[in-house]
UniProtKB/Swiss-Prot annotation:
This is Pantothenate synthetase. GO terms for cellular component: cytosol. Beta-alanine binds at Q61. It catalyses: (R)-pantoate + beta-alanine + ATP = (R)-pantothenate + AMP + diphosphate + H(+). It comes from Bacillus velezensis (strain DSM 23117 / BGSC 10A6 / LMG 26770 / FZB42) (Bacillus amyloliquefaciens subsp. plantarum). It is an enzyme of class 6 (ligase).
Length: 286
């Protein structure tokens, strides 16, 4: 596995790969890798000639009160895991390399960001879209891989690729979970022992909501109340529990088509997100 830190190094290597006609799979991350990230690398490795993983804790997507400096980092461990999973190139640029002085241009996301996590993290997805535009221009991937645990991010990336006519296939991969259903996340390390026991209730609540929809419930408020009633039995504080059309993330008075049931729960030192995406039309046909 090649490890690169400078954008010029990466540009030269990508130019070589493209001249050889190789397909490139790209897995962007902020590091502190877990099985969810590695699943993306493994899938990318099966579907492309070359896999590029980036590790970059992006300062522009951290909002007020979010501690950029405290985000967990362990590059030596991450490099070992990335190589074992099948990454061919690990790109770990510095903030000064990705953001050279004052920016002339930044991406502003107009839709899909005023709900779910975006509602309380103003500017977050602008930072995500800006850095991904930079990465996409550097890596020039055939396919880009994102986990559906952050389904709002995947929806924003879908819009970014579509609106800017990027010749990139977005591959959205199902959430990887612990045996008890908790979505794997770098933030799980911040849970206390008691909170770790309670956290799987988030996914259980979403499953109950999805089951209601499967059984014919089409009122969003009824489904959401079922979810919140279950989560309120934990010590976590619900940030949101919401239902929208997916990937448009627009509200629905009556549930139909593809929808996302999503929630965020704040524990003492960890804010956990999770979701279930439900294709109602597909369920009704089966």
């Amino acid at each position: 596995m090649k490890q690169l830190t400078e954008t010029q190094q990466l540009k030269e290597l990508i130019a070589q790969y493209r001249s050889e006609g190789r397909t490139i799979g790209f897995v962007p991350t902020m590091g502190f890798l877990h099985e969810g990230h590695l699943t993306l690398v493994e899938k990318a490795s099966k579907e492309n000639d070359i896999v590029v993983m980036s590790i970059f804790v992006n300062p522009t997507q951290f909002g007020p009160g979010e501690d950029y400096e405290a985000y967990p980092r362990d590059l030596k461990r991450d490099a070992r895991l990335a190589e074992q999973a099948g990454a061919d190139v690990l790109f770990t640029p510095s903030p000064s390399d990705m953001y050279k002085g004052e920016q002339n241009v930044a991406v502003q996301v107009k839709r899909r960001t005023d709900v779910l996590c975006g509602a309380s993290r103003v500017g977050h997805f602008d930072g995500v879209a800006t850095v991904l535009t930079k990465f996409f221009n550097l890596v020039k991937p055939t396919r880009a891989y994102f986990g559906l645990k952050d389904a709002q991010q995947a929806a924003v990336v879908d819009g970014l690729i579509e609106d800017f006519f990027m010749d990139i296939e977005l591959v959205a991969v199902d959430t990887v979970r612990e045996e008890d259903g908790l979505a794997k996340s770098s933030r799980n390390v911040y849970l206390t022992e008691q909170e770790r026991k309670e956290a799987p209730m988030i996914y259980k609540a979403l499953q109950q909501g999805a089951e209601l929809i499967r059984d014919g419930e089409r009122n969003p408020e009824t489904v959401i109340k079922t979810v919140t009633d279950i989560i309120e039995n934990t010590s976590g504080v619900i940030d949101y529990a919401e239902l929208y059309a997916y990937p448009e993330l627009t509200p629905l008075k009556t549930l139909n088509g593809k929808v996302i049931l999503a929630c965020a729960v704040q524990f003492s030192k960890a804010r956990l997100i999770d979701n279930i995406i439900i294709d109602i039309d597909e369920w009704e046909r089966s």
